[in-house]
């Protein structure tokens, strides 16, 4: 957790387009170590696609029977439990309980908004999720400016990012 101390947040200090250089590296962003508690905390904030309890869970499974996958008690449960239930994650071929892809996408944007500051505007972002980040993993996000250009009156930069575990 000590790696979070070094996180650079530009905030209200403007980053001027004229000062940006092609090839410039952004500060490395650290995320982790991955924990099941962290996976659940993300699901609490996001809401999850299928995470419901009690009567709401019954309504979902009753309306969409294929959503429910029997747990160890034979009760239909959500597929998202691969994120907090180690045995189920292993059963489906994952290396263990693992993080959420949308959260990982948000980390990439977090790095860019920290770098650009409050006055910047994130115009476009896309990413590819290629592997799981199981509990215990630590993630390091590296990025660099690949292009600096103008489109009409817009002053833009393109940034390439890669995230790797320990």
PLM regions and their residue ranges:
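Phosphate-handling active-site elements
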Residues: 116-122, 150-151
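HotDog/MaoC-like acyl-thioester-processing domains
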Residues: 1-8, 12-22, 28, 41, ...
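Hot-dog-fold acyl-thioester-processing enzymes
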Residues: 1-119
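Short, hydrophobic/aromatic alpha-helical segments in well-folded domains
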Residues: 111-112, 128, 144
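Short structured motifs
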Residues: 13, 124-130
């Amino acid at each position: 957790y000590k790696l979070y101390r070094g996180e650079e947040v530009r905030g209200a200090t403007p980053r001027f387009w004229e000062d940006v250089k092609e090839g410039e590296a952004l500060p490395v962003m650290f995320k982790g170590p991955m924990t099941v508690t962290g996976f659940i905390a993300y699901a609490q904030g996001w809401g999850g696609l299928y995470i419901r309890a009690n009567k709401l869970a019954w309504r979902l499974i009753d309306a969409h029977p294929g959503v429910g996958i029997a747990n160890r008690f034979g009760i239909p449960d959500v597929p998202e439990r691969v994120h907090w239930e180690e045995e189920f994650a292993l059963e489906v071929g994952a290396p263990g309980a693992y993080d959420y892809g949308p959260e990982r996408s948000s980390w990439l944007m977090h790095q860019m908004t920290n770098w650009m500051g409050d006055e910047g505007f994130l115009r476009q972002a896309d990413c590819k999720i290629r592997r799981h980040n199981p509990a215990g993993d630590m993630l390091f996000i590296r990025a660099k400016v690949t292009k600096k250009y103008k489109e009409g009156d817009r002053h833009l930069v393109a940034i390439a990012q890669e995230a790797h575990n320990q």
